[in-house]
Swiss-Prot record:
Enzyme Commission identifier(s): 3.1.-.-
Residue pairs linked by disulfide bridges in the UniProt entry: none
Annotated family: Belongs to the endoribonuclease YbeY family.
Domain of life of the native organism: Bacteria
Name of protein: Endoribonuclease YbeY
One GO MF term: RNA endonuclease activity
Enzyme class per UniProt: hydrolase
Binding positions (Zn(2+)): 125, 129, 135
Position of the signal peptide: none
Taxonomic lineage from the root: Bacteria, Bacillati, Bacillota, Bacilli, Lactobacillales
Described purpose of this protein according to its UniProt entry: Single strand-specific metallo-endoribonuclease involved in late-stage 70S ribosome quality control and in maturation of the 3' terminus of the 16S rRNA.
Pfam family, one: YbeY
Length: 160
């Protein structure tokens, strides 16, 4: 997986946690059998920044833990490629995830587990949204998404 990590925090996200995000998302990509050339980004930010995104794009006037921006590719507005390029393996950008490091800290403390478990939980949660899963559609969809999320994290080794 081609993963861009952007750190917009004031304090900085340490290399260990950036590497953890890379490893967890690479594992999740393999778990979902995504092509190796799948692209996405994760941006770390503070509450002030994610609050602005939450307000602008979701109409919710407060910070949140994670926001996903999926890149929809329905094919209707994509250019037609020459035949010789049709068989080429083109990278597929699935979207962007924004994560509040402030909320990672507070939720990990509140839930009684490690910062690493909460970080993994949030990036996998956002990753699943980028891949079409949506817990807001109903009880069955919520169960499917959260079961898959737990399965990925447990199998990776980030258990509660």
């Amino acid at each position: 997986m081609d993963l861009a990590i952007i750190d917009q925090t004031k304090a900085g996200v340490n290399q260990y946690h950036q590497d953890l995000v890379r490893c967890v998302l690479d594992y999740a990509g393999k778990y979902l059998e995504l092509p190796d050339n799948t692209e996405m980004s994760v941006t770390f930010m503070n509450n002030e920044e994610i609050h602005q995104y939450n307000k602008k794009y979701r109409g919710i006037d407060k910070p949140t833990d994670v926001i996903s921006f999926a890149i929809e590719e329905d094919g209707d507005d994509l250019p037609v490629l020459p035949d010789e390029l049709m068989d080429a393996e083109l990278a597929k950008n699935i979207g962007d995830i924004l994560v509040s490091v402030d909320i990672i800290n507070s939720q990990a403390e509140y839930l009684g587990h490690s910062y690493e478990r909460e970080l993994g939980f949030l990036v996998v949660h956002g990753f699943l949204h980028l891949n079409g899963y949506d817990h807001m559609l109903g009880d069955a969809e919520e169960k499917e998404m959260f079961d898959l999320q737990r399965e990925i994290l447990d199998n990776y080794g980030l258990k509660r």
